[in-house]
């Protein structure tokens, strides 16, 4: 078997389905599939993720002309900030309206740095809504890290880049909010080797004993998979919700824009978010996309930055040919070309890229 048949099994945990793909070293997607969850709104939906993975392994098809792939590793990403207890009890990222930390004049300065944390409000919400489970669980995981733990027994939290700490938490701020510091697994870096699949999981899934590589947030996997990691690149991640993401070399903050670090040191990502995009009427949806692009374009002009002429799209909406054509035609009127990258599910490509990078630079489980 040729070395080119070596693959990473990339896994992305979505809101309603699990996606899987076989990704080669050069980023080629040999095959991919999607497995819907039987009850995506069930409070214990996370318990079904490993069963969806098993179904994906059985379902994923390899073209007859190709040799059987040699799976070298699994790479896992998923939606966030979904939270899961060890029992599988799940607080999904989109269940409740976005909430902010309650800060006042008595709040210590170190906590104020976390005013825009993505995870802390959800952790506090979990504690308040499901207090018994919060107390009983040894660990509280982000979504993809729960599956990593199931597969390897290793409890981790993926911190995409050191500057992301204020979007997550640190020991001091957890203590300040009365959250046991040991309940949130320790941070590991993007591409961390969580260790091999356990023997039981190898047998259950029908997979070889290979390492599980931590990718973490699907947001990060999507940016990597679309190449939105260089200044002046932009992508449109459009599934059940939508985010237009612009990579820049300046930290720019503005109303209506979420500013987060890029995984590339020194760069930043500006996001305009459209919650529940897929459920909006098409005309309303497209006008929100146009407004988001115009906002980012204005910020670029105000800060002396060139705005790109091409946007790479990914996600479920990219698979709807009629909608994609309508959106592309509208953006052409703005002088912008809308394209699809290697595949419509760029998160899988990003997972593969992270895993292959980790395999080229081996690191023992930490």
Residues of each region from the PLM?
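N-terminal glycine/serine-rich phosphate-binding loop of ATP-dependent small-molecule kinases
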Residues: 1-87, 91, 136, 202-214, ...
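Gly/Ser/Thr-rich active-site cleft segment
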Residues: 13-15, 110-217
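Glycine-rich phosphate-binding loops at beta-strand->alpha-helix junctions
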Residues: 17, 189-197, 307-330
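Phosphate/ATP-binding catalytic cores across multiple sugar-kinase/actin-like superfamilies
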Residues: 53-60, 219, 285-308, 354, ...
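Beta-strand segments within the central parallel beta-sheet cores of soluble alpha/beta enzyme folds
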Residues: 73-74, 139-141, 182-190, 211-214, ...
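Glycine-rich phosphate-binding loop of actin/hexokinase-like ATP-binding domains
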Residues: 82-105, 137, 141-171, 210-284
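A short glycine/serine-rich beta->alpha loop
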Residues: 108-115, 134-136, 207-211, 264-271, ...
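Glycine-rich phosphate-binding/hydrolytic loop that grips phosphoryl groups
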Residues: 218-225, 274-275, 287, 318-319, ...
């Amino acid at each position: 078997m040729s070395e080119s048949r070596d693959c990473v099994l990339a896994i992305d945990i979505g809101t309603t389905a699990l996606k899987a793909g076989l990704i080669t070293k050069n980023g080629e997607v040999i095959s991919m599939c999607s497995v819907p969850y039987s009850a995506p709104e069930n409070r214990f939906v996370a318990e079904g993720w490993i069963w969806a993975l098993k179904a994906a392994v059985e379902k994923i098809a390899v073209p007859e002309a190709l040799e059987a792939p040699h799976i070298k590793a699994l790479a896992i990403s998923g939606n966030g900030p979904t939270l899961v207890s060890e029992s599988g009890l799940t607080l999904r990222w989109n269940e409740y309206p976005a909430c902010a930390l309650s800060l006042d004049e008595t709040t210590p300065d170190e906590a104020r740095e976390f005013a825009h944390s993505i995870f802390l409000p959800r952790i506090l919400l979990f504690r308040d809504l499901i207090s018994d489970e919060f107390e009983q669980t040894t660990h509280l995981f982000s979504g993809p890290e729960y599956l990593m733990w199931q597969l390897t027994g290793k409890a981790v939290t993926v911190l995409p880049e050191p500057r992301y700490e204020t979007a997550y938490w640190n020991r001091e701020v957890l203590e300040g909010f009365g959250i046991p510091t040991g309940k949130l697994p320790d941070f590991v870096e993007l591409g961390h080797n969580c260790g091999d699949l356990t023997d039981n999981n190898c047998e259950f899934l029908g997979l070889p004993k290979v390492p599980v590589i931590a990718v973490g947030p699907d947001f990060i996997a999507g940016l990597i998979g679309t190449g939105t990691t260089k200044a002046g690149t932009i992508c449109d991640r459009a599934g059940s919700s939508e985010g237009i993401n612009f990579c820049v070399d300046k930290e720019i903050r503005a109303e209506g824009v979420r500013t987060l670090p890029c995984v590339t040191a020194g760069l930043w990502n500006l996001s305009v978010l459209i919650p529940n995009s897929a459920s909006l009427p098409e005309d309303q949806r497209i006008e929100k996309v146009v407004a988001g692009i115009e906002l980012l374009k204005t910020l670029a002009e105000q800060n002396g930055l060139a705005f790109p002429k091409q946007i790479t799209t990914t996600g479920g909406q990219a698979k709807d040919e009629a909608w994609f054509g309508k959106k592309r035609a509208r953006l052409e009127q703005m002088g912008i070309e809308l394209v699809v990258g290697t595949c419509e599910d760029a998160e899988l490509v990003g997972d593969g890229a992270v895993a292959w990078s980790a395999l080229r630079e081996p690191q023992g489980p930490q």
